[in-house]
């Protein structure tokens, strides 16, 4: 069965062929997806028999490797496959067979995306934030202080000028915004005075309008021409290593070239010496009706979000909301170290359910809870209890809390004593 899949098998690991692309700086980038089988914490050989018969206590692991020419290799977290699909049917799969099917599906999807990348008209995915409500100490160890900016709850957008002089405005996922003529008109005027190679990175926004309304306007072919473009960064495809503080200086110079813009704005920068100053600014911004704050490492390069990469040179500060929800079930994580670790399932008044990660339990405690907590014990001690949940925001589409973490039960309950 191994010979039915494209790729090479070596050292007990099967790797699909590399999918190669070229970065905007001209370097070759490679993405590889691999499958291995683990039994009792040991990688074991993959045999053809595993495609028809499961091996006791064995799980399959899928992972990817990504590297740019002359750069370090980044290895993803393991996705574990613990059971096949369609069990009991003619088309049933074993653990290993299912893992290979899943990996092949991801391989084909990535290959299609990369084929399309050659016709993406110069789109570079914007830099994404890694840290949430944490500012690394290294931000304050640079010669230049980090800067803080207002965080607007809008729609991410990047602007660039194409070879024919037309303005391209696209999303975080490299989807072109077809409307927004009021913004594109001003961008075209601005590009008459600046380096046409520069990309402007920002957010589509209208103050105090809900995100759902903003997204609807941004994605409409014909919009109401009310949205504004707030630019918080800029970059050049061949100068991605340029530090953040230098990019901000150039961005200020860009906006000095044309100061009569109505719908395009440079985001205001605030230099901070320590975490307390950043937190005070965050509190100020929230009072003003904004979502929070963004902190930028002064010496950080511009790191595009290829393959959903999140840059360690950005931090997002937002208030955590909290509310109480009814606990109705429990489950486990699906990938990596979360597999086998307990998760709570809560229910909204409209009966929609969502998963909550216990905040104050160690992984060891979560593993033990999932292993020892029976449905009978859960029903007797936990079902229907009110669970205090902190979260970043509610999904505008479903109303489900996002980034939800369980703080504790309303009534004092030590869940570890139950087991």
Curated annotation (Swiss-Prot):
Region (AD domain): 121-317
SUPFAM superfamilies assigned to the protein according to its UniProt record, in alphabetical order: DNA ligase/mRNA capping enzyme, catalytic domain, Nucleic acid-binding proteins
GO cellular component: virion component
Name of the protein in its database record: DNA ligase
Domain free text: The N-terminus domain (NTD) plays a critical role in DNA-binding, catalytic complex assembly and catalysis.
Site location (Important for the catalytic efficiency): 153, 211, 402-403
Binding of a divalent metal cation 2, residues: 291
Cofactor(s) this protein requires: a divalent metal cation
InterPro entries: DNA_ligase_ATP-dep_cent (IPR012310), DNA_ligase_ATP-dep_CS (IPR016059), NA-bd_OB-fold (IPR012340), NAD_dep_DNA_ligaseB (IPR050326)
Localization per Swiss-Prot or TrEMBL: Virion
One Pfam family matching this protein: DNA_ligase_A_M
A GO molecular-function descriptor: ATP binding
Catalysed conversion reaction: ATP + (deoxyribonucleotide)n-3'-hydroxyl + 5'-phospho-(deoxyribonucleotide)m = (deoxyribonucleotide)n+m + AMP + diphosphate
Location of the active site: 151 (n6-amp-lysine intermediate)
